[in-house]
């Protein structure tokens, strides 16, 4: 598996060309003089029902797993007891630069070192992506590693830890799932370690909450302009945002769906994400008002949400 680092310039139409850069970090609703020509172009390409690759404009499962582990601090560690029964207990954990879980345990582990660490990340009450790390649990190798892992724990939790209570899970493979009751994708250890967590991970939730609170008109407009729909949208909310785009939850009389809308180009920080959103909002408004043509490919893939605790209207909020 190759990590996804390329731009989508070859796959998408030209990216937004702002006459004047947007300096503000707030989300704005731009309204232009319809008599003035515009040069802004935003691209939304049709996605395919395939694993996460460049064609789906989504991060690879390895990247998603790394982001989940970076954002989370608690999980369920399952090991085999001395009598052979599986036992799962809640644990706190940190991760090192390669994504290796670092645990603090007050008990000795089973002679059978096989273990699984299951971690979930709720996204704005609408979706719960998760990953399960399979590997061998054991003590760090030497004093140098111990000191480094102690520093990792201290940075994560702001507290000192007894070095003799530190354990690590040597990652063998990772099962990544987008939500409850969905099929997972296995990620190789090398892909997981070489992947980078999403650059927006620490700010994504705040951005999404701002949009859902203040830009609902824009989100409805995105559904109508950028997505090829043949039904009326009753309600919609943004689920999550990453460097390649964002996911929307759409409620309708026909059912509940998730849809992926890509950014015109990859973003790497808060300013880039908000500028891209504002540019897409402006273009959608002008297309809706017939001030410019819808000169882009609409998203055609909608993923129906079934059997999820988050699928009811309002997302449990």
Swiss-Prot record:
Protein name: Glutamyl-tRNA reductase-binding protein, chloroplastic
Keywords: Chlorophyll biosynthesis, Chloroplast, Heme biosynthesis, Plastid, Transit peptide
Cellular component GO terms, alphabetical: chloroplast; chloroplast stroma; chloroplast thylakoid; protein-containing complex
Subunit and interaction comment: Interacts with HEMA1 and forms a heterotetramer of two GLUTRBP and two HEMA1 subunits.
Cell location: Plastid, Chloroplast stroma
Keyword Chloroplast: yes
Keyword Magnesium: no
Role played: Involved in the regulation of glutamyl-tRNA reductase (GluTR) which is important for the synthesis and distribution of 5-aminolevulinate, a precursor in heme and chlorophyll biosynthesis. Stimulates GluTR activity and regulates glutamate-1-semialdehyde release. May play a role in heme metabolism. Necessary for efficient photosynthetic electron transport in chloroplasts.
Gene from which this protein is expressed: GLUTRBP
Feature: transit peptide: 1-42
Gene Ontology BP annotations: chlorophyll biosynthetic process; heme biosynthetic process; photosynthetic electron transport chain; positive regulation of heme biosynthetic process; post-embryonic development; tetrapyrrole biosynthetic process
GO molecular function (one): protein-membrane adaptor activity
Phenotypic effect of disruption: Reduced growth, slightly pale green leaves, reduced levels of chlorophyll and heme, and low non-photochemical quenching (NPQ).
Record-linked SUPFAM superfamilies: FMN-binding split barrel (SSF50475)
Pfam (any one): DUF2470
PANTHER family per UniProt: CREG1 PROTEIN (PTHR13343), GLUTAMYL-TRNA REDUCTASE-BINDING PROTEIN, CHLOROPLASTIC (PTHR13343:SF22)
Lineage: Eukaryota, Viridiplantae, Streptophyta, Embryophyta, Tracheophyta
